[in-house]
UniProtKB/Swiss-Prot annotation:
Name this protein carries in UniProt: Circadian input-output histidine kinase CikA
Xref: PROSITE patterns: HIS_KIN (PS50109), PHYTOCHROME_2 (PS50046), RESPONSE_REGULATORY (PS50110)
Induction statement: In light/dark cycles, increases in the dark phase and decreases in the light (at protein level). Rapidly degraded in the presence of the quinone analogs DBMIB (2,5-dibromo-3-methyl-6-isopropyl-p-benzoquinone) and DCBQ (2,5-dichloro-1,4-benzoquinone), artifical electron acceptors for photosystem II that reduce the plastoquinone pool. Oxidized but not reduced DBMIB leads to protein degradation (at protein level). Low constant protein levels in the absence of ldpA.
Domain Histidine kinase: 390-611
The reaction(s) this protein catalyses: ATP + protein L-histidine = ADP + protein N-phospho-L-histidine
């Protein structure tokens, strides 16, 4: 598109009044085919008004604004006949229309049409189409004009030159517009070669695009240079199908270029051959090719991109020898320059696309790698969590037995123990305690990292927590000849704190145990506790070996310890401080260390006060508990034990059955007030029980409460259940649900005992 400010005009032509009127009609029909069209001409004015405005026409449409001027007001007043031919001029652009209307006070409302367009740019294709209309009007008007006014023919060469210039400008504008609008080089070259052939009235137009590697490899050979057809790409346009196509490698197996031609091409010079007989003696192979494809005259123009030969623009005349004109050479050179710009843009765009694609591929590869790594890590983490969940009970139970039994043996046996026996049993006991401590740390750390740890927030006394924790380590400190000191900077007003006391106790035990472990005999360990606003600060200081500054950063990393000699002397796994940091951050707090080698270390922990969860409703009163039994169907011992203990502690009477067949047989005998069933069911017999309850809905039967580990397949089951609870069970929700489903207590004797 041409910018709206670039007003275009065509050279002035001469038309008779009849020819001008025909041109007005043709323009009106042309504009009517365009979107947002507006047309007005002076034929609608009275004759005396036309003597003031002159003959004109205004056409406005999307991409097209034109002012057509015929006889001026002054020419209307001249004495020569009105039938004489007059100059006709054409101006493009909204500015030309506005200036003319303001100068002549033309009575036409054109402004709304311009305002409706918004975009006042010009479309070169529409300008070209109107130029064809103008040429046709001049040609139709010229035949009678030549007979009446012979002098008009004197202007014919000038008109031809103007027409040629107009076509040249149109073609260059079209190529330029296509370059701006498209980055498809093949499309640009195909369109350009067709327009060039038509403009030159040539029989064949060709663009040869050399492949870079062919030139680099071929320039070292002997001259004339031979470029095989597989080393270039050919774009061709022919006048008709009767002419042979040079795209066919059987017709043109390659290009021959002489030394002189190549040197001229490198300088950007055009080669004009009016007769191919020029090659008969100089390059017989080339002459033979031209005879085969019927070429009489040839024009060759190099296309240079960044100073390097990219290809050739070639035109063939096949009917007769043709004397190439300078104007033909000039337009081909101009087009070659514009093509050079288009090619360079396409190359840059191609490089950018390649780089973009490469980067996108890298991003996709890295993203996929990250996705795979994440999936692998998630799978590993899930496997670890599943393993730890499965093994936690299996690990802790035998260790508890080992510790418990060895402790019992140390205190009681069927006879006196020898010193060695006592040492052996004590070694078993101590090793078991150490192993249990290690396993607990690993399981706790894994639970926190998996996001499964939750705080049990409640109010507690900071001073009592600190005192009890310190007392726990008194024996260990006494054996190491280390003095434990407690500094409580608290009063009764700030002593009560809301957090998870069990987790805080674990934090303090880890820090104090470390302090005792790394403090030499006769040393001192201090525990200081104070409040700062809504935060509690715990500080553990020791007079131990200290920690080098270079190693302090890795203290809170899992399985990280000090150097090997210290690890051999003091032991440890490197989990305690990592777990401590996780527990502190679980509270939303932070931990800090200050240490000097040979003087000791100080760990300071800041814990913000936690928000207390809503108080749990009181346990149902025994006086309000219903009479009767609750029937529990659960195959897992641990899950059943938890539910039984929970309900028994609340005052309910529970009957636990593993299979549904027993429950079905004894349903009338047991007469439960509620049936609790785990889903998926333990066995198929439970499904028979459900079917029985469904088929006897008309009869009174106890409410059904389901514990869901996964959603039920049968939608009728959901409708049949009186309540559905998710695993793991919420104790308060279970008790509240049962209280709502159970019938009221009718007799004192049937109440469950406490």
């Amino acid at each position: 598109m041409l910018a709206p400010s670039s007003n275009c005009s065509l050279a002035s032509q001469r038309l008779t009044p009849e020819g001008f009127a025909q041109l007005q009609s043709a323009l009106q029909d042309f504009v009517a085919t365009l979107p947002q069209a507006f047309y007005w001409d002076s034929r609608s004015l009275h004759t005396h008004l036309r003597t003031q405005t002159g003959d004109c026409a205004i056409a406005i449409a999307a991409g097209f604004q034109l002012l057509l001027l015929g006889r001026t007001a002054a020419e209307y007043c001249q004495p020569h006949p009105l039938s004489e031919p007059h100059h006709v001029s054409v101006q493009f652009g909204a500015d030309s229309i506005q200036r003319y209307c303001q100068a002549t006070n033309l009575p036409v409302e054109y402004q709304p049409a311009l305002a409706q367009l918004g975009d006042l740019s010009l479309n070169p294709d529409l300008i070209s189409q109107f130029s064809n209309l103008l040429i046709a009007a001049i040609a139709a008007d010229r035949a009678p004009l030549a007979a009446q006014y012979p002098a008009v023919s004197v202007c014919q060469p000038l008109e031809q030159a103007l027409h040629w210039q107009e076509e040249q400008d149109r073609l260059i504008s079209q190529v330029s517009a296509q370059i701006r609008l498209s980055l498809d080089l093949s499309e640009i070259l195909t369109t350009t070669i067709r327009e060039i052939r038509q403009l030159l009235n040539a029989d064949r137009a060709i663009i040869y695009q050399f492949k870079p590697q062919c030139l680099d490899a071929g320039l070292d050979q002997r001259w004339p240079l031979y470029i095989p057809s597989q080393s270039y790409i050919t774009y061709e346009d022919r006048r008709n199908e009767a002419l042979l196509s040079v795209i066919d490698p059987l017709v043109q197996p390659g290009l021959l270029i002489t030394t002189e031609e190549w040197q001229r091409f490198q300088q950007g010079e055009t080669l004009l051959i009016d007769s191919v007989g020029f090659y008969k003696e100089r390059l017989p192979e080339q002459y033979s090719f031209y005879e085969r494809v019927q070429v009489r005259s040839v024009c060759k123009i190099p296309i240079l991109v960044q100073g390097r030969i990219w290809g050739l623009l070639v035109a063939h005349q096949c009917q007769q020898d043709h004397r190439w004109q300078p104007r033909e050479r000039d337009i081909l050179q101009h087009l070659a320059e514009h093509l050079s710009i288009a090619i360079y843009q396409a190359q840059l765009y191609g490089q950018l696309q390649d780089q973009t694609q490469t980067l996108e591929n890298r991003v996709l590869e890295r993203t996929q790698e990250l996705i795979d790594a994440l999936a692998l890590a998630q799978a590993a983490n899930a496997a670890k969590g599943e393993f730890l969940a499965t093994m936690s009970h299996e690990l802790r139970t035998p260790l508890t037995c080992v510790i418990g039994m060895s402790s019992t043996l140390l205190r009681w046996a069927f006879g006196p123990l020898t010193e060695r026996q006592r040492e052996y049993i004590k070694a078993i006991h101590d090793s078991g305690e150490h192993l249990l401590e290690l396993i607990n740390d690993i399981l706790d750390l894994s639970q926190i990292e998996a996001g499964k740890a939750a705080l049990q927030v409640r109010p507690f006394s900071l001073s009592r927590l600190a005192t009890q924790t310190l007392n726990t380590l008194q024996e260990k400190a006494r054996l190491g000849e280390i003095q434990l000191m407690l500094d409580l900077q608290l009063n009764n007003r700030v002593d009560v704190f809301r957090a998870d006391p069990k987790r805080l106790r674990q934090i303090l035990i880890n820090l104090l145990s470390n302090a005792v472990k790394f403090t030499e005999p006769q040393g001192t360990v201090f525990l200081r506790v104070w409040r700062e606003g809504d935060r509690a600060i715990f500080q553990v200081s020791d007079t131990g070996i200290g920690i080098p500054e270079s190693e302090q950063a890795q203290l809170f990393q899992k399985f990280q310890q000090l150097d090997t000699s210290i690890r051999r002397q003091y032991g440890g796994t490197g989990l305690g401080l990592a777990l401590t940091k996780q527990l502190v951050e679980l509270h939303g707090g932070h931990i800090q260390i200050e240490s000097t080698v040979g003087q000791g270390s100080t760990f300071t922990v800041w814990i913000p006060e936690q928000t207390l969860i809503e108080p749990v409703e009181p346990r149902p009163s025994i006086d309000n508990l219903p009479a009767g039994h609750i029937l529990l169907l659960e195959e897992e011992d641990e899950a059943a034990t938890v539910v039984c203990e929970m309900l028994t502690a609340a005052g309910f009477k529970v009957i636990w059955l593993v299979d549904g067949s027993t429950a079905l047989d004894q349903l009338d005998l047991l007469q439960p007030i509620v049936i609790l069933m785990a889903w998926p069911p333990p066995d198929q017999s439970c499904l028979l029980l459900l079917q029985h309850l469904r088929e006897h809905q008309a009869d009174p039967h106890p409410p059904l409460v389901l514990f869901l580990g996964e959603p039920p397949v049968d939608p009728l089951l959901t409708a049949q259940a009186s309540a559905i609870l998710s695993k793991p069970l919420d104790p308060q929700l279970l008790l509240t649900t049962l209280q709502g489903l159970c019938p009221p207590n009718l007799s004192e004797g049937d109440r469950p005992s406490s």
